[in-house]
Amino acid sequence: AFAAAAQAERGSDGEVRIIYWQAPSILNPYLSSGTKDLESASLALEPLARFDETGTMVPLLVDELPTVDNGGVSEDLTRITWKLTPGILWSDGTPLTSADVKFTADYCMHPEGGCAQNPKFENVASIETPDAQTVVINFDKPTPYPYAMFVGGETPILQQAQFQDCVGAKAPECTEANFNPIGTGPFVVTEFRPNDVITFEANQNYRDPSKPAFAKVLFKGGGDATAAGRAVMETGEYDYAWNLQLAPDVIAGMEAAGKGKAVAGFGPLMERIMLNNTNPDPALGPDERSVIRPHPFLSDPAVYKAMSLAIDRPLLVEIGYGKAGRVTCNWVPAPATYDSDTFDCSTQDIAGANKMLDDAGIVDTDGDGIREKDGVPLKILYQTSTNAVRQDFQALIKQWWSEIGIESELRNINASVFFGGDPGSPDTFQKFYADVEMYSNTFNGTDPQAYLGNALCDDAPRPDTQWQGQNVARFCSEEYDALHQELTQTANLEERARIAKALNDMVIEQGGMIPLVHRGRISAHANDLGGVKLNVWDSEIWAIADWHRIKE
C-alpha cells in the first residue's frame, strides 16, 4: 500500500505521447462521428456512464446506474433518472450540474443543429431537472434500453456556460469551444492544431487527486498505420499507436525490435460464411432466384453441420489474423454477456463430417467424388470480396469441403461492388446469387437487439425491397421472430442476455450461417506504459486517467 501511495501523485510521470494515423479535426463529439475525433475528445469530455473493456456499463459521473430494480428506471420503461455524484467540478472549477446534462440533450436535439449523435436521443419527450444533481429523461414510449444517450464517449456532457451561445445553426461556428471544450475528464486542452497535433495537461480539478499520473499528453495525428506502429514498437518515439490495420507478420516484425507490444481488442466483428436458405439456381427467373425457399440441399442440417465440422478454424485464425483473431462459433461473439457457450467448433473433424453425411443418406451414388441429396449433387458457388486473406480462406475451405464430397466453385468480387448495394447488380452480397458467401459484420454499442433483428423473416432482401434488407441468408423462423419480439419488450439485462443467446443459437443450429473468426482491433503501446486496457465498446483510450509509466 505504501508503494502505491508513494507513486500516486498527479502529474508525476511527465509526458505521454499518442499517435493516431487519422488526425483529429474537432473536439466536439456532437459535430463529428469520426473515431479519431471522439477518442481525442474523451480525454477532456465525459459521459454519465461508460462501457469498460468487457462491454459492461460502469458509472462515471454518477454513483450508480439507474435500473428498474433500484427505481432509476420506471416500471413502464418510459423514464430514467440519473443522480450526479456530488462535488464534481468542471476543469474551470465550476460545479457540474443537472442543467449541463439537460443543456447537452437540448443542444443535440435542436432541429437546426445537425447533431452527429441524433439517433441516440430518439424518443425523448422531455427532460426535467428537479434539483442540481437530478436529471429525469422522459420517453414518448416504453424504452427497454434507455442508455443510448450519455453512456459512452459519443455522447458526453458539454458545459452549458461554454456552449449556450452555440446552439442550432451556430454550433459549427463556435470554433473556440469546439476546439477547446471544458470538461470533467482527466486532461484539459492547452492547444489544438486541427489535423495535426493536440497538447493536453492534467486537469487540476479532476475528482481523483492522485490522477492522472501524466502531467501532459502530446496527441499527434497523421501518417499511416505502418509509420505509427514503427513509432511505438521500433523507434520508441511514441507511447501509444491506434488501430494498426497491418498483417500479423508485419506487426510481429515491429514487436521484435523490443520497444513495445501490440494489443488486440475484440468487439462483435465476426467473419462468417452465410448460407443461402433460398434457391439461387440461375435457371429461375429474377422474381424467384434467391427468393423461393428452400435451398435444394443447404436446408438439410446434416449438410451445413458437416460443412462447419470440416473447417479448421484455428488454422484460419493463424493464417489470416494472428493475435487479432479468435475462433468463434457464434453470430454474436461479444460482449461476453451475450457470447453463447452452446457450441464448440474449435476442432476440425473430417471423419465426423463424412459420417454425418453418410448417416443422413447423402452419398456419392455415381462415383464422381461428389455426394448427392435427392439426386442433386452437392456443388456450391462460394463467393466473397476480393481480399488476400479471404482468397486464402476460400482455397483452404474448398479443399476441406472436397474431402467430404462437396465441390466448390470460388468467386471473388470487387469489394465496392459486392458491398455496394446496387439493386441492378447481380454481384451484391444482398442479392446473394450464390450458395454461400463470406464476409464480416458487426454492430455498435453493446446491445445486440437491432443486430439480431437481421434474421427476421421480413428483413430478407427481395425484388419488392429493391434487394435491400439485412437478412442476407433469407433465414426465416416464426419461433425466432416471436422470441425477438419478446427481446424488444424485455428490460432486465440478465433476461435480455438469455434471450439474445437463444436467438444466436437458433440461427446457428437452423443453418443461417457458419461463424469462422472473431476479429479484433490492434493497437500498440510502449513496454513501460502501464494501465492500458484496450476498449472496443467505447473510446479506446477510455482508461487514460489510469495510465502511468512503469518504473524499472
Predicted feature locations:
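Extracytoplasmic/periplasmic ligand-capture domains
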Residues: 4-10, 50-53, 65, 70-71, ...
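Short N-terminal segments immediately surrounding and downstream of signal-peptide cleavage
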Residues: 8-22
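N-terminal lobe/hinge region of extracytoplasmic solute-binding protein
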Residues: 19-73, 106, 182-184
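Mature extracytoplasmic/periplasmic domains
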Residues: 166, 324-342, 522-524
